[in-house]
Amino acid sequence: MAAIVIVGAQWGDEGKGKATDILGGLVDYVVKPNGGNNAGHTVVVGGEKYELKLLPAGVLSETATPILGNGVVINLEALFEEIDGLEARGADASRLRISANAHLVAPYHQIMDRVQERFLGKRAIGTTGRGIGPTYQDKVGRVGIRVQDIFDESILRQKIESALDVKNQVLVKMYNRKAIVAEETVQYFLSYADRLRPMVIDATLELNKALDEGKHVLMEGGQATMLDVDHGTYPFVTSSNPTAGGACVGSGVGPTRITSTLGIIKAYTTRVGAGPFPTELFDKWGEYLQTVGGEVGVNTGRKRRCGWYDSVIARYASRVNGFTDYFLTKLDVLTGIGEIPICVAYEVDGVRHDEMPMTQSDFHHAKPIFETMPAWDEDITGCRTFEELPQKAQDYVRRLEELSGARFSYIGVGPGRDQTIVLHDVMES
Protein backbone atom coordinates (compact mmCIF):
# COMPACT_ATOMS: atom_id res chain seq x y z
CA MET A 1 0.00 0.00 0.00
CA ALA A 2 1.28 3.44 -0.96
CA ALA A 3 -0.45 6.79 -0.60
CA ILE A 4 1.63 9.48 -2.26
CA VAL A 5 0.86 13.21 -2.29
CA ILE A 6 2.27 15.41 -5.07
CA VAL A 7 2.53 19.12 -4.22
CA GLY A 8 3.90 22.09 -6.13
CA ALA A 9 6.65 23.74 -4.09
CA GLN A 10 6.63 27.19 -5.74
CA TRP A 11 3.82 29.21 -7.38
CA GLY A 12 2.55 26.50 -9.70
CA ASP A 13 3.55 25.30 -13.17
CA GLU A 14 6.40 23.25 -11.69
CA GLY A 15 5.67 20.13 -13.73
CA LYS A 16 3.23 18.28 -11.48
CA GLY A 17 1.54 16.81 -14.55
CA LYS A 18 4.73 15.07 -15.61
CA ALA A 19 5.28 13.62 -12.15
CA THR A 20 1.70 12.38 -12.04
CA ASP A 21 2.02 10.92 -15.51
CA ILE A 22 5.12 8.96 -14.50
CA LEU A 23 3.70 7.66 -11.22
CA GLY A 24 0.13 7.36 -12.48
CA GLY A 25 0.97 4.22 -14.41
CA LEU A 26 2.16 2.57 -11.19
CA VAL A 27 -0.87 3.26 -8.99
CA ASP A 28 -4.51 2.21 -8.88
CA TYR A 29 -6.05 5.64 -8.24
CA VAL A 30 -5.05 9.19 -9.12
CA VAL A 31 -6.93 11.82 -7.14
CA LYS A 32 -7.23 15.56 -7.64
CA PRO A 33 -8.05 16.85 -4.14
CA ASN A 34 -8.40 20.60 -4.68
CA GLY A 35 -8.73 23.43 -7.18
CA GLY A 36 -10.75 23.68 -10.36
CA ASN A 37 -10.14 24.54 -13.99
CA ASN A 38 -8.06 27.55 -12.96
CA ALA A 39 -4.70 25.79 -13.14
CA GLY A 40 -3.54 23.83 -16.16
CA HIS A 41 -0.77 21.36 -16.70
CA THR A 42 0.89 19.83 -19.72
CA VAL A 43 1.57 16.12 -20.09
CA VAL A 44 3.52 14.56 -22.96
CA VAL A 45 2.59 10.94 -23.71
CA GLY A 46 3.95 9.07 -26.70
CA GLY A 47 5.11 12.33 -28.25
CA GLU A 48 1.60 13.78 -27.92
CA LYS A 49 1.10 16.91 -25.82
CA TYR A 50 -2.05 17.09 -23.69
CA GLU A 51 -3.08 20.27 -21.90
CA LEU A 52 -5.30 19.49 -18.95
CA LYS A 53 -7.12 21.99 -16.75
CA LEU A 54 -9.74 20.36 -14.55
CA LEU A 55 -8.92 16.69 -15.01
CA PRO A 56 -6.01 15.06 -13.16
CA ALA A 57 -3.09 13.92 -15.30
CA GLY A 58 -3.95 10.39 -14.21
CA VAL A 59 -6.83 10.44 -16.68
CA LEU A 60 -4.23 9.55 -19.32
CA SER A 61 -3.16 6.43 -17.45
CA GLU A 62 -4.35 3.21 -19.07
CA THR A 63 -4.94 1.50 -15.75
CA ALA A 64 -5.51 4.00 -12.92
CA THR A 65 -8.92 5.31 -11.88
CA PRO A 66 -8.89 9.14 -11.87
CA ILE A 67 -11.00 10.83 -9.19
CA LEU A 68 -12.04 14.43 -8.62
CA GLY A 69 -12.15 14.67 -4.83
CA ASN A 70 -14.48 16.52 -2.51
CA GLY A 71 -12.10 19.49 -2.34
CA VAL A 72 -12.39 20.22 -6.06
CA VAL A 73 -14.76 22.84 -7.47
CA ILE A 74 -16.17 21.65 -10.79
CA ASN A 75 -17.33 23.65 -13.79
CA LEU A 76 -19.50 21.06 -15.55
CA GLU A 77 -19.33 22.73 -18.94
CA ALA A 78 -15.52 22.82 -18.74
CA LEU A 79 -15.41 19.24 -17.45
CA PHE A 80 -17.29 17.75 -20.37
CA GLU A 81 -15.51 19.93 -22.91
CA GLU A 82 -12.21 18.57 -21.60
CA ILE A 83 -13.46 14.98 -21.62
CA ASP A 84 -14.79 15.33 -25.17
CA GLY A 85 -11.50 16.86 -26.30
CA LEU A 86 -9.50 13.95 -24.89
CA GLU A 87 -11.80 11.32 -26.35
CA ALA A 88 -11.64 13.00 -29.76
CA ARG A 89 -7.90 12.33 -29.65
CA GLY A 90 -8.36 8.69 -28.71
CA ALA A 91 -7.94 8.97 -24.94
CA ASP A 92 -10.27 7.01 -22.66
CA ALA A 93 -11.86 9.07 -19.88
CA SER A 94 -14.55 6.52 -19.02
CA ARG A 95 -12.88 5.56 -15.72
CA LEU A 96 -13.26 9.09 -14.29
CA ARG A 97 -15.09 9.23 -10.98
CA ILE A 98 -16.28 12.28 -9.03
CA SER A 99 -16.95 12.79 -5.34
CA ALA A 100 -20.61 13.44 -4.53
CA ASN A 101 -19.40 16.10 -2.08
CA ALA A 102 -17.43 18.18 -4.59
CA HIS A 103 -18.80 21.68 -5.11
CA LEU A 104 -20.00 23.04 -8.45
CA VAL A 105 -19.10 26.29 -10.17
CA ALA A 106 -22.29 28.09 -11.17
CA PRO A 107 -22.47 30.63 -14.01
CA TYR A 108 -23.07 33.32 -11.39
CA HIS A 109 -19.76 32.48 -9.71
CA GLN A 110 -17.93 33.32 -12.92
CA ILE A 111 -19.88 36.55 -13.30
CA MET A 112 -19.09 37.59 -9.72
CA ASP A 113 -15.41 36.74 -10.19
CA ARG A 114 -15.00 38.90 -13.30
CA VAL A 115 -17.06 41.79 -11.96
CA GLN A 116 -15.14 41.89 -8.68
CA GLU A 117 -11.75 41.82 -10.41
CA ARG A 118 -12.81 44.64 -12.72
CA PHE A 119 -14.09 46.64 -9.76
CA LEU A 120 -10.78 46.25 -7.89
CA GLY A 121 -8.80 47.67 -10.82
CA LYS A 122 -5.12 48.02 -9.89
CA ARG A 123 -5.81 46.20 -6.64
CA ALA A 124 -7.01 43.10 -8.48
CA ILE A 125 -5.50 39.79 -7.41
CA GLY A 126 -5.17 38.49 -10.96
CA THR A 127 -7.61 35.59 -10.83
CA THR A 128 -8.39 33.53 -13.93
CA GLY A 129 -11.98 34.79 -13.85
CA ARG A 130 -13.34 31.25 -13.81
CA GLY A 131 -15.36 31.60 -10.62
CA ILE A 132 -13.12 29.46 -8.43
CA GLY A 133 -12.81 31.94 -5.56
CA PRO A 134 -16.54 32.76 -5.39
CA THR A 135 -17.35 29.03 -5.42
CA TYR A 136 -15.08 28.43 -2.45
CA GLN A 137 -16.61 31.47 -0.75
CA ASP A 138 -20.04 29.90 -1.06
CA LYS A 139 -18.67 26.57 0.17
CA VAL A 140 -17.29 28.15 3.35
CA GLY A 141 -20.43 30.28 3.66
CA ARG A 142 -22.50 27.07 3.53
CA VAL A 143 -24.55 28.19 0.55
CA GLY A 144 -22.69 26.20 -2.10
CA ILE A 145 -24.05 23.66 -4.56
CA ARG A 146 -22.59 20.17 -4.42
CA VAL A 147 -22.53 17.47 -7.09
CA GLN A 148 -25.18 15.44 -5.25
CA ASP A 149 -27.58 18.40 -5.30
CA ILE A 150 -28.23 18.31 -9.04
CA PHE A 151 -29.94 14.93 -8.67
CA ASP A 152 -32.66 16.47 -6.50
CA GLU A 153 -34.36 19.29 -8.39
CA SER A 154 -36.19 20.73 -5.39
CA ILE A 155 -33.02 21.01 -3.31
CA LEU A 156 -31.13 22.42 -6.28
CA ARG A 157 -33.76 25.08 -6.95
CA GLN A 158 -33.96 26.04 -3.28
CA LYS A 159 -30.19 26.46 -3.00
CA ILE A 160 -29.89 28.52 -6.18
CA GLU A 161 -32.78 30.81 -5.27
CA SER A 162 -31.34 31.33 -1.80
CA ALA A 163 -27.88 32.15 -3.19
CA LEU A 164 -29.24 34.57 -5.78
CA ASP A 165 -31.32 36.47 -3.23
CA VAL A 166 -28.03 37.90 -1.99
CA LYS A 167 -25.93 37.87 -5.16
CA ASN A 168 -28.50 39.73 -7.23
CA GLN A 169 -28.62 42.47 -4.61
CA VAL A 170 -24.85 42.86 -4.94
CA LEU A 171 -24.84 42.70 -8.74
CA VAL A 172 -27.67 45.18 -9.23
CA LYS A 173 -27.08 47.68 -6.44
CA MET A 174 -23.30 47.63 -6.13
CA TYR A 175 -22.06 46.74 -9.61
CA ASN A 176 -24.99 48.05 -11.70
CA ARG A 177 -25.45 44.69 -13.47
CA LYS A 178 -28.55 42.75 -14.48
CA ALA A 179 -30.06 40.31 -12.03
CA ILE A 180 -29.50 36.61 -12.75
CA VAL A 181 -32.60 34.49 -13.38
CA ALA A 182 -32.62 31.53 -10.99
CA GLU A 183 -34.49 29.18 -13.32
CA GLU A 184 -31.83 29.54 -16.02
CA THR A 185 -29.18 28.37 -13.55
CA VAL A 186 -31.38 25.47 -12.42
CA GLN A 187 -31.83 24.27 -16.00
CA TYR A 188 -28.10 24.71 -16.67
CA PHE A 189 -27.24 22.20 -13.95
CA LEU A 190 -30.08 19.79 -14.73
CA SER A 191 -28.90 19.55 -18.33
CA TYR A 192 -25.75 17.76 -17.12
CA ALA A 193 -27.37 15.45 -14.55
CA ASP A 194 -27.83 12.35 -16.72
CA ARG A 195 -24.30 12.39 -18.07
CA LEU A 196 -22.80 13.09 -14.67
CA ARG A 197 -24.71 10.48 -12.65
CA PRO A 198 -22.65 7.36 -13.59
CA MET A 199 -19.44 9.11 -12.55
CA VAL A 200 -20.50 10.06 -9.02
CA ILE A 201 -19.25 7.99 -6.07
CA ASP A 202 -18.52 8.13 -2.36
CA ALA A 203 -14.86 8.90 -3.04
CA THR A 204 -13.74 8.80 0.59
CA LEU A 205 -15.14 5.29 1.02
CA GLU A 206 -13.69 4.11 -2.30
CA LEU A 207 -10.17 5.38 -1.57
CA ASN A 208 -9.97 4.08 1.98
CA LYS A 209 -11.24 0.66 0.91
CA ALA A 210 -8.57 0.63 -1.79
CA LEU A 211 -5.85 1.39 0.75
CA ASP A 212 -7.22 -1.31 3.07
CA GLU A 213 -6.82 -3.75 0.17
CA GLY A 214 -3.18 -2.77 -0.34
CA LYS A 215 -3.77 -0.70 -3.46
CA HIS A 216 -1.80 2.41 -4.38
CA VAL A 217 -3.23 5.95 -4.38
CA LEU A 218 -1.63 9.07 -5.83
CA MET A 219 -2.97 12.50 -4.88
CA GLU A 220 -2.17 15.24 -7.37
CA GLY A 221 -2.48 18.67 -5.77
CA GLY A 222 -3.36 21.64 -7.95
CA GLN A 223 -1.65 25.06 -7.82
CA ALA A 224 1.19 25.10 -5.29
CA THR A 225 2.44 25.82 -1.78
CA MET A 226 3.01 29.54 -2.31
CA LEU A 227 -0.58 29.88 -3.55
CA ASP A 228 -2.08 28.20 -0.48
CA VAL A 229 -4.73 30.39 1.15
CA ASP A 230 -3.09 29.90 4.58
CA HIS A 231 0.59 29.33 3.79
CA GLY A 232 1.04 31.26 0.54
CA THR A 233 1.68 34.90 -0.35
CA TYR A 234 -1.71 36.08 0.90
CA PRO A 235 -3.78 37.72 -0.55
CA PHE A 236 -2.16 36.77 -3.87
CA VAL A 237 -3.22 33.15 -3.48
CA THR A 238 -5.86 30.68 -4.54
CA SER A 239 -8.92 29.94 -2.41
CA SER A 240 -8.03 26.41 -1.35
CA ASN A 241 -5.21 24.55 0.43
CA PRO A 242 -2.97 23.01 -2.25
CA THR A 243 -0.53 21.78 0.39
CA ALA A 244 -0.14 18.21 1.67
CA GLY A 245 -2.63 18.73 4.50
CA GLY A 246 -5.17 20.00 2.00
CA ALA A 247 -4.79 16.82 -0.03
CA CYS A 248 -5.98 14.82 2.96
CA VAL A 249 -8.96 17.12 3.51
CA GLY A 250 -9.83 17.20 -0.20
CA SER A 251 -9.80 13.44 -0.60
CA GLY A 252 -10.95 12.06 2.74
CA VAL A 253 -7.73 10.09 3.18
CA GLY A 254 -6.33 10.60 6.68
CA PRO A 255 -2.78 11.91 7.23
CA THR A 256 -1.56 8.71 8.91
CA ARG A 257 -2.14 6.84 5.65
CA ILE A 258 0.24 9.01 3.62
CA THR A 259 3.49 7.17 2.85
CA SER A 260 5.34 9.82 0.78
CA THR A 261 4.97 13.52 0.07
CA LEU A 262 6.66 14.54 -3.17
CA GLY A 263 7.42 18.21 -3.82
CA ILE A 264 7.67 19.31 -7.44
CA ILE A 265 10.11 22.16 -7.99
CA LYS A 266 11.65 23.80 -11.05
CA ALA A 267 15.38 24.34 -11.43
CA TYR A 268 14.39 28.03 -11.55
CA THR A 269 11.22 29.83 -10.42
CA THR A 270 8.10 31.14 -12.16
CA ARG A 271 4.91 32.87 -11.18
CA VAL A 272 1.70 33.93 -12.96
CA GLY A 273 -0.32 36.93 -11.85
CA ALA A 274 0.32 39.56 -9.22
CA GLY A 275 2.21 39.19 -5.96
CA PRO A 276 5.74 39.30 -4.53
CA PHE A 277 8.53 37.36 -6.25
CA PRO A 278 12.00 38.04 -4.75
CA THR A 279 14.15 36.44 -7.47
CA GLU A 280 12.16 37.77 -10.44
CA LEU A 281 14.23 38.75 -13.47
CA PHE A 282 13.60 41.77 -15.66
CA ASP A 283 16.58 41.33 -17.98
CA LYS A 284 17.59 39.10 -20.88
CA TRP A 285 17.80 36.05 -18.60
CA GLY A 286 14.17 36.42 -17.63
CA GLU A 287 13.26 36.48 -21.30
CA TYR A 288 15.59 33.53 -21.92
CA LEU A 289 13.93 31.37 -19.26
CA GLN A 290 10.52 32.39 -20.54
CA THR A 291 11.37 31.47 -24.12
CA VAL A 292 13.49 28.34 -23.67
CA GLY A 293 11.35 27.06 -20.82
CA GLY A 294 8.12 27.67 -22.74
CA GLU A 295 6.77 29.65 -19.83
CA VAL A 296 3.27 30.47 -21.00
CA GLY A 297 0.27 29.49 -18.88
CA VAL A 298 -1.67 26.46 -20.13
CA ASN A 299 -4.93 27.84 -18.81
CA THR A 300 -4.66 31.56 -19.40
CA GLY A 301 -2.06 32.00 -22.13
CA ARG A 302 -0.36 34.57 -19.90
CA LYS A 303 3.42 34.74 -19.93
CA ARG A 304 4.92 33.56 -16.67
CA ARG A 305 7.21 35.77 -14.64
CA CYS A 306 10.61 34.10 -14.34
CA GLY A 307 13.40 34.17 -11.77
CA TRP A 308 16.24 32.15 -10.30
CA TYR A 309 15.91 29.20 -7.92
CA ASP A 310 14.84 30.29 -4.45
CA SER A 311 16.01 27.91 -1.74
CA VAL A 312 14.25 29.91 0.98
CA ILE A 313 10.94 29.03 -0.64
CA ALA A 314 12.10 25.43 -1.15
CA ARG A 315 12.90 25.03 2.56
CA TYR A 316 9.62 26.67 3.51
CA ALA A 317 7.64 24.37 1.21
CA SER A 318 9.47 21.35 2.57
CA ARG A 319 8.63 22.37 6.11
CA VAL A 320 4.96 23.22 5.48
CA ASN A 321 4.30 20.01 3.54
CA GLY A 322 6.65 17.62 5.30
CA PHE A 323 8.24 16.61 2.00
CA THR A 324 9.98 13.26 1.97
CA ASP A 325 11.28 13.82 -1.56
CA TYR A 326 11.69 16.43 -4.30
CA PHE A 327 11.19 16.08 -8.05
CA LEU A 328 13.41 18.69 -9.77
CA THR A 329 12.10 19.67 -13.21
CA LYS A 330 13.40 21.57 -16.24
CA LEU A 331 17.08 21.20 -15.43
CA ASP A 332 17.75 21.16 -19.19
CA VAL A 333 16.53 24.76 -19.54
CA LEU A 334 19.64 25.99 -17.70
CA THR A 335 22.08 24.43 -20.17
CA GLY A 336 24.61 26.89 -21.59
CA ILE A 337 23.73 30.02 -19.62
CA GLY A 338 27.17 30.59 -18.10
CA GLU A 339 26.58 31.16 -14.41
CA ILE A 340 23.50 30.22 -12.41
CA PRO A 341 22.55 32.33 -9.37
CA ILE A 342 20.87 30.52 -6.47
CA CYS A 343 18.98 32.48 -3.83
CA VAL A 344 20.21 31.21 -0.46
CA ALA A 345 18.69 33.86 1.83
CA TYR A 346 16.94 37.25 1.85
CA GLU A 347 17.89 40.68 3.07
CA VAL A 348 15.05 42.66 4.61
CA ASP A 349 15.86 46.19 5.79
CA GLY A 350 19.52 45.28 6.19
CA VAL A 351 18.85 42.06 8.12
CA ARG A 352 19.61 38.61 6.70
CA HIS A 353 16.75 36.08 6.72
CA ASP A 354 17.67 32.45 6.07
CA GLU A 355 14.03 31.41 6.40
CA MET A 356 10.73 32.79 5.13
CA PRO A 357 9.95 36.17 6.75
CA MET A 358 7.07 35.99 9.19
CA THR A 359 5.07 38.86 7.65
CA GLN A 360 3.97 39.46 4.09
CA SER A 361 5.19 43.04 4.42
CA ASP A 362 8.73 41.78 5.00
CA PHE A 363 8.41 39.28 2.16
CA HIS A 364 7.36 42.08 -0.20
CA HIS A 365 10.57 43.91 0.71
CA ALA A 366 12.85 40.86 0.61
CA LYS A 367 15.94 41.14 -1.58
CA PRO A 368 17.60 37.88 -2.67
CA ILE A 369 21.09 36.98 -1.49
CA PHE A 370 22.70 34.90 -4.23
CA GLU A 371 25.54 32.50 -4.62
CA THR A 372 26.50 31.44 -8.14
CA MET A 373 27.48 28.17 -9.72
CA PRO A 374 28.86 27.47 -13.20
CA ALA A 375 26.45 26.10 -15.78
CA TRP A 376 27.18 23.27 -18.20
CA ASP A 377 27.17 23.38 -21.99
CA GLU A 378 26.48 19.74 -22.79
CA ASP A 379 23.02 18.57 -23.94
CA ILE A 380 21.52 16.67 -21.01
CA THR A 381 18.15 15.72 -22.54
CA GLY A 382 19.41 12.20 -23.26
CA CYS A 383 20.77 11.52 -19.77
CA ARG A 384 18.99 8.75 -17.89
CA THR A 385 21.26 8.31 -14.87
CA PHE A 386 22.71 10.88 -12.51
CA GLU A 387 26.24 9.84 -13.47
CA GLU A 388 25.54 10.68 -17.12
CA LEU A 389 24.95 14.33 -16.23
CA PRO A 390 27.92 16.70 -16.71
CA GLN A 391 29.80 17.26 -13.45
CA LYS A 392 28.64 20.88 -13.26
CA ALA A 393 25.01 19.79 -13.56
CA GLN A 394 25.56 17.20 -10.83
CA ASP A 395 27.12 19.86 -8.61
CA TYR A 396 24.18 22.22 -9.19
CA VAL A 397 21.64 19.54 -8.29
CA ARG A 398 23.51 18.49 -5.17
CA ARG A 399 23.80 22.10 -4.01
CA LEU A 400 20.07 22.63 -4.46
CA GLU A 401 19.43 19.45 -2.51
CA GLU A 402 21.62 20.68 0.35
CA LEU A 403 19.65 23.93 0.48
CA SER A 404 16.10 22.66 -0.02
CA GLY A 405 15.16 20.50 2.96
CA ALA A 406 14.43 17.15 1.29
CA ARG A 407 16.26 14.65 -0.86
CA PHE A 408 16.09 14.96 -4.65
CA SER A 409 14.64 11.70 -5.95
CA TYR A 410 13.71 12.63 -9.52
CA ILE A 411 15.31 14.97 -12.05
CA GLY A 412 13.54 16.10 -15.21
CA VAL A 413 15.83 16.68 -18.21
CA GLY A 414 13.12 17.28 -20.82
CA PRO A 415 9.33 17.31 -21.25
CA GLY A 416 8.91 13.64 -22.12
CA ARG A 417 7.89 10.97 -19.64
CA ASP A 418 11.13 9.10 -20.35
CA GLN A 419 13.31 12.19 -19.90
CA THR A 420 13.60 11.61 -16.18
CA ILE A 421 16.43 10.49 -13.92
CA VAL A 422 15.25 8.39 -10.97
CA LEU A 423 17.48 8.48 -7.89
CA HIS A 424 14.95 7.08 -5.40
CA ASP A 425 11.61 5.43 -6.17
CA VAL A 426 8.89 6.80 -3.89
CA MET A 427 6.79 3.71 -4.60
CA GLU A 428 9.36 1.75 -2.62
CA SER A 429 9.74 4.26 0.23
Swiss-Prot record:
UniProt record, GO biological process: 'de novo' AMP biosynthetic process; IMP metabolic process
Binding-site positions, IMP = 13-16, 38-41, 128, 142, 223, 238, 302
Amino-acid positions noted as binding substrate in the UniProt annotation, renumbered to this chain: 298-304
Co-factor remark: Binds 1 Mg(2+) ion per subunit.
Give the keywords, sorted. Answer: Cytoplasm, GTP-binding, Ligase, Magnesium, Metal-binding, Nucleotide-binding, Purine biosynthesis
SUPFAM superfamilies (alphabetical): P-loop containing nucleoside triphosphate hydrolases (SSF52540)
Q: Which GO terms describe its cellular component?
A: cytoplasm
Pathway, per Swiss-Prot/TrEMBL?
A: Purine metabolism; AMP biosynthesis via de novo pathway; AMP from IMP: step 1/2
Needs which cofactor? Answer: Mg(2+)
Catalyses: IMP + L-aspartate + GTP = N(6)-(1,2-dicarboxyethyl)-AMP + GDP + phosphate + 2 H(+)
PROSITE patterns given for it?
ADENYLOSUCCIN_SYN_1, ADENYLOSUCCIN_SYN_2
Active site at 13 (proton acceptor), 41 (proton donor)
Which residues bind Mg(2+) per the record? 13, 40
Per the record's keyword annotation, is Metal-binding included, yes or no? Answer: yes
Q: What does the UniProt entry say about where the protein is found?
A: Cytoplasm
Q: What is its EC number?
A: 6.3.4.4
Q: Relate the assembly described in the record.
A: Homodimer.
Name of protein: Adenylosuccinate synthetase
Species per Swiss-Prot/TrEMBL record: Corynebacterium efficiens (strain DSM 44549 / YS-314 / AJ 12310 / JCM 11189 / NBRC 100395)
Q: What does UniProt list as this organism's lineage?
A: Bacteria, Bacillati, Actinomycetota, Actinomycetes, Mycobacteriales
